Amino acid sequence: MKVCNMQKGTLPVSRHHAYDGVVIKRIEKELCKTIKDRDTESKKKAICVIKEATKKAESLRIDAVCDGYQIGIQTAFEHIIDYICEWKLKQNENRRNIEDYITSLLSENLHDERIISTLLEQWLSSLRNTVTELKVVLPKCNLALRKKLELDLHKYRSDVKIILKYSEGNNYIFCSGNQVVEFSPQDVISGVKIELAEKLTKNDKKYFKELAHKKLRQIAEDLLKENPVND
């Protein structure tokens, strides 16, 4: 039997491989694998970079929101300060109007002939009945009071002689011997205005404190709604 040399009838081992009917050299295959691996690695790195960038962007966004919130709070306080100034100016204007009204009202009433007549009668009743002469100094702004006083005193103490004088001031002065009393409508008005100012100041401070806190809370809530910060 003749032994055939199989090696002679066999093609040498090729370094080529067939993929889908296309012969590809091994080196080309390895190159393709390397490219694929590098592509995969590049994608992984790209994903990491994107994630890191996204994370950083989110951090920056949160920082921006926080910064915006702080700026918002600062702006809110500036608005509050402006509000305080405007409010105080308005309150001062209102207070002046109230004080002017009270001054006008009291000035009319405190110069009323019935009040002066009553004061004079009460003062006379506190003196001894030996009073025979009475000096009364009236402000020129109330000349019309003379006849009223003369009539009232004649009814009350017909035995007392009245000497009337006038002054440029606003006070009423009653004299009998060494006894002197002075009635100042302006002092009464000033006292009432001081008492009123104290009450208004106390109420204003309480009212403003409550209102300011309410406005600050509202501004903070509005800022949080506009700039939500996710943990």
Curated annotation (Swiss-Prot):
<keyword id="KW-0614">Plasmid</keyword>
<dbReference type="GO" id="GO:0015031">
    <property type="term" value="P:protein transport"/>
</dbReference>
<protein>
    <recommendedName>
        <fullName>Type 3 secretion system stator protein</fullName>
    </recommendedName>
</protein>
<keyword id="KW-0653">Protein transport</keyword>
<keyword id="KW-0813">Transport</keyword>
<dbReference type="GO" id="GO:0005737">
    <property type="term" value="C:cytoplasm"/>
</dbReference>
<comment type="function">
    <text>Component of the type III secretion system (T3SS), also called injectisome, which is used to inject bacterial effector proteins into eukaryotic host cells. Acts as a regulator of the Spa47/SctN ATPase activity. It down-regulates the ATPase activity of the oligomeric Spa47/SctN, while it up-regulates the activity of the monomeric form. Important for translocation of MxiH/SctF, the major needle component.</text>
</comment>
<keyword id="KW-0963">Cytoplasm</keyword>
<keyword id="KW-0843">Virulence</keyword>
<comment type="subunit">
    <text>The core secretion machinery of the T3SS is composed of approximately 20 different proteins, including cytoplasmic components, a base, an export apparatus and a needle. This subunit is part of the cytosolic complex. Interacts directly with Spa47/SctN (T3SS ATPase) and Spa33/SctQ (the major sorting platform component). Homodimer in solution.</text>
</comment>
